[in-house]
């Protein structure tokens, strides 16, 4: 499990150019050959590139320093030094790059395979062969390589969750997302604990799933009551909906009906999304009987049962997430 990062700072540097070479041709029968010092290689660039299978910025640490390679120095016999290797920083789609010092946005990478050169490497210095003239037949100097550049950047990722947890207030969404991810969604026993989406990431075999703990829905949400419009705006972007229903309450079917009705009224297309019905709080009295009744009533739905405190059904639920989401 990894903490989801939607913003972090990186200090990136392009490579220095290699120094030009001071060299003179020395061959048999040519004791005083002319200058033959080659040019230095260019320094590596800093390139940001979108990678299709990335969903988070978790490849990097906040404040991490990353550098492209320096160019190699020139050599005799007019041989140029090798160019420094570019630094390629892979990011998910919808990543914005800011100058952290000025807070100005520099670039926006939205689509797969988008790429941008953020910093050019330093130019290689000229070798002394370039400075030979009718008045300077044996130049004993060459150019140093140009220094690379450094930027303090802030990356910001626009979050789009694969899975949206929906339910009435206190259905257990925040506790569930805290259980299966590194998120620490604020948990308390009163309605509207979640007022904005909280995001967590589940990682299995280097595949990431982004899960959003969305604000609790109430009856009338489709009319803007409570946090309705905000809730429904966020939910429309997710691939899969997870209806979390508290089966320790005898009103479990009413909770299901409210969720279905509010989605239908706001946008009937939301009901076409893939969904799982998850019965929560199986550890409480009467919950198992209600869970069995829920499965019987919703026989055509995929219904799973969990208990966060007894760890019942958690692994099965995570496996179900990965089987449904297109990684």
Swiss-Prot record:
Its EC number is 3.6.5.-. It comes from the Bacteria. It comes from Borrelia duttonii (strain Ly). This is GTPase Obg. PANTHER family: DEVELOPMENTALLY REGULATED GTP-BINDING PROTEIN-RELATED, MITOCHONDRIAL RIBOSOME-ASSOCIATED GTPASE 2. Keywords: Cytoplasm, GTP-binding, Hydrolase, Magnesium, Metal-binding, Nucleotide-binding. One of its GO terms (molecular function) is magnesium ion binding. InterPro entries: G_OBG (IPR031167), GTP-bd (IPR006073), GTP-bd_Obg/CgtA (IPR014100), GTP1-OBG_CS (IPR006074), GTP1_OBG_dom (IPR006169), GTP1_OBG_dom_sf (IPR036726), OBG_GTPase (IPR045086), P-loop_NTPase (IPR027417). GO terms for biological process: ribosome biogenesis.
């Amino acid at each position: 499990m990894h903490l989801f990062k939607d913003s972090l700072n990186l200090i990136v540097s392009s490579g220095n150019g290699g120094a030009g070479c001071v060299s003179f041709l020395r061959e048999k029968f040519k004791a005083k050959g002319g200058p033959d010092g080659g040019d230095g290689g260019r320094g590596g660039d800093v390139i940001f590139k979108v990678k299709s299978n990335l969903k988070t910025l978790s490849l990097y640490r906040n404040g991490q320093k990353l550098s492209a390679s320096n160019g190699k120095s020139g050599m005799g016999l007019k041989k140029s030094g090798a160019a420094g290797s570019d630094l390629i920083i892979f990011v998910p789609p919808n990543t914005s790059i800011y100058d952290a010092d000025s807070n100005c946005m520099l670039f926006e990478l939205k689509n797969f395979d988008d790429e941008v050169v953020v910093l050019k490497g330093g130019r290689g210095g000229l070798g002394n062969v370039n400075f030979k003239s009718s008045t300077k037949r044996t130049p004993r100097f060459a150019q140093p390589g140009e220094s690379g550049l450094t930027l303090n950047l802030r990356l910001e990722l626009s979050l789009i969750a694969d899975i949206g947890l929906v339910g009435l207030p206190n259905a257990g969404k925040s506790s569930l997302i805290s259980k299966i991810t590194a998120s620490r969604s604020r948990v308390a026993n009163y309605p509207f604990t979640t007022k904005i989406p909280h995001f967590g990431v589940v990682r299995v075999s280097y595949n990431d799933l982004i899960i959003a703990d969305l604000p609790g829905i109430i009856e009338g949400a489709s009319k803007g009551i409570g946090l309705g419009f905000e809730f429904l705006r966020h939910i429309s972007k997710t691939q899969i909906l997870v209806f979390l229903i508290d089966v320790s309450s005898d009103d479990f079917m009413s909770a299901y009906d409210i969720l279905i009705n509010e989605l239908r009224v706001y946008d009937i297309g939301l009901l076409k999304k893939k969904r799982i019905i998850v019965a929560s709080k199986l550890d409480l009295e009467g919950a198992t009987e209600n869970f069995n009744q829920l499965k019987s009533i919703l026989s055509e739905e995929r219904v799973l049962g969990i208990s966060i405190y007894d760890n019942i059904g958690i692994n099965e639920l995570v496996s179900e997430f990965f089987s449904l989401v297109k990684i």
